[in-house]
């Protein structure tokens, strides 16, 4: 997998209360990923970008909510979420380098 595809597959971490609990208690990390990304692509992207060993990848397609605006109905974009489980002894720390 080339470096350009790695950055197109992983769009960024998904920060939420549930994702924080998963990271603290179970060592699982949640990412927003491209809608056409496969589990194997996501695994290779995380392993090459963060130098960790991935045990399991689960994905969910999240449907965008319908929102009411002054001009009628609108819809948020659909997106894909990946939950990354690391092998025991591995840790992913992408929050400490952000300043």
Swiss-Prot record:
The keyword Ribosomal protein applies. GO terms for cellular component: ribonucleoprotein complex; ribosome. Pfam families: Ribosomal_L23 (PF00276). InterPro entries: Nucleotide-bd_a/b_plait_sf, Ribosomal_uL23-like, Ribosomal_uL23/eL15/eS24_sf. It comes from the Bacteria. One of its GO terms (molecular function) is structural constituent of ribosome. The keyword Glycoprotein does not apply. GO terms for biological process: translation. Coiled coil: none annotated. Keywords: Ribonucleoprotein, Ribosomal protein, RNA-binding, rRNA-binding. Belongs to the universal ribosomal protein uL23 family. Part of the 50S ribosomal subunit. Contacts protein L29, and trigger factor when it is bound to the ribosome. One of the early assembly proteins it binds 23S rRNA. One of the proteins that surrounds the polypeptide exit tunnel on the outside of the ribosome. Forms the main docking site for trigger factor binding to the ribosome. This is Large ribosomal subunit protein uL23. It comes from Ectopseudomonas mendocina (strain ymp).
